[in-house]
Amino acid sequence: GEDWELQKNHNKRSVGLMLMNNSLCSGALINNTENDGTPYFLTAEHCTVGENASTFSFLFGWISPSTSCATVTGSQSGPMNMTISGSTKRAEYAPSDFSLLEINQSIPTGWDRVFAGWDRSGTIPDFTVAIHHPGGDVMKFARDNQSPDKINYSNPLYVWEIKDAFGGWDLGITEPGSSGSPLFDHNGRIIGQELGG
């Protein structure tokens, strides 16, 4: 919606499609507290577990000039020339399906990428937005206009639950390939990554 247009145009520049041996997932460049441009990439642990991160490839900026809103079909493909390969696992945690990679090269400045900010305060957002590559398609958006629930997923681990996630998005959908995509709050900060929905 118009209330998130500035954040959308900024944060979509952080999102990428991660290609592994026989699968793909979404994720995002995420900032650190030093704000030094270290190429950290947040994604889902189930995408990276047992895989050799040095073989991963990352595609950025795959945005359609004429996206069919809220569908995975009917979109035209945009340019696919911002690709970089190789990464190192820096952290992962299976209970929350979290994986943090460091891409082995700096992101070229000419790509005009951004490193998304994040918020771990636990403050309940007004609404949430996922930016992702469902089924490996061009970038799409899913939005839930309700505040998410904070649920006990695996004691003592709490996660955000999109109400009725399997069909509960008010705009768009998530599907295989969306895993690992950043979940943004109403302020445009990452509050988690997509798992199980």
Q: What is the meaning of each model-derived region?
A:
Residues 1, 168-169:
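Active-site-adjacent structural elements in folded domains
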Residues 28-36, 172-195:
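Catalytic nucleophile loop of clan PA
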Residues 20, 128, 170-173, 185:
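Exposed boundary/loop context
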Residues 1-162:
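Serine endopeptidase catalytic core focused on the charge-relay Asp
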